[in-house]
Amino acid sequence: QHP
C-alpha cells in the first residue's frame, strides 16, 4: 500500500 502507498503511504
UniProtKB/Swiss-Prot annotation:
Please, which domain of life does this record's source organism belong to? Eukaryota
Residue positions, PTM Pyrrolidone carboxylic acid: Q1
Keywords from the named record: Amidation, Pyrrolidone carboxylic acid, Secreted
GO cellular component annotations, sorted alphabetically? extracellular region
Intracellular or extracellular location(s): Secreted
**Which region is the signal sequence?**
none
The Proline amide modification is found at P3
What's its job? Functions as a regulator of the biosynthesis of TSH in the anterior pituitary gland and as a neurotransmitter/ neuromodulator in the central and peripheral nervous systems.
Q: Of which family is this protein a member?
A: Belongs to the TRH family.
Per its record, how is this protein called by name?
Answer: Thyrotropin-releasing hormone
Q: Which organism is it from?
A: Sus scrofa
> Gene encoding this polypeptide?
TRH
